[in-house]
Amino acid sequence: GLGDVYKRQLFAYWIPKTLKNIDICTIPEDHNPGVSNAFMYGGFLCGILSLICELAKGFIPVYLGQKYLDINSMLFVPVLVAPVFGHAFPFLQKEKGGKAITASFGVLLGLFPELHPAVYLAFFFIFFSVVVIINPHSLRSILTFGFFAFNVLLTIKTASIQIGCFIIAVIVIYSCLLYTSD
């Protein structure tokens, strides 16, 4: 339905393409249709609109999903994973998927009031960007999502959230490896 179409939209690709006639997949070395490239090559407006849309892509289905599904049920796992998977692997579209980092943050924020997973992800991104600086960005993202998943598995008691976060980490790590092999 409409949700399937929405989660597969690469807003960070389409917004700069529509507003500035820029294909952000052809300019940067990583060819990633991500929010950081929308900011860098499309400017502030393209970047902020992309950020809002990509966060919403993950937030809306998870936030609404927990209103109608029991988050303790394994049926909640696909609700967590679908926006990230749809961004990383946008079937039936000519564009290559993105790393799904921003969509992952949206999913985790959608777990409100349970924000520990989102805080873990933000903490490790900041830690590996400011305290122990890891470059290139793809390696930073791989380590961040690895530590994020490990901490969720250790501290979050809800199995569906543990499994969903683990699968999200695997998807993003795989996507980062795809982009570094280009």
Residue ranges and their predicted role:
Residues 1-9, 179-182:
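Conserved small/polar residues in nucleotide/adenosyl-binding loops
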Residues 4-9, 84-94, 130-135:
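Transmembrane alpha-helix interface/packing and boundary motifs in multi-pass membrane proteins
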Residues 14-44, 181:
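Cytosolic, membrane-interface loops and tails of multi-pass inner-membrane proteins
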Residues 24-31, 91-105, 136-147:
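Short, non-helical or kinked segments that cap or interrupt transmembrane helices
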Residues 34, 39-66:
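Multi-pass membrane catalytic core of lipid/isoprenoid biosynthesis enzymes
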Residues 42, 65, 101-134, 147-155:
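Interfacial segments of multi-pass membrane proteins
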Residues 62-78, 110-118, 154-164:
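Helix-coil boundary and interhelical linker segments in multi-pass alpha-helical membrane proteins
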Residues 116-123, 138-145, 156-169:
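Loop-to-transmembrane alpha-helix initiation sites
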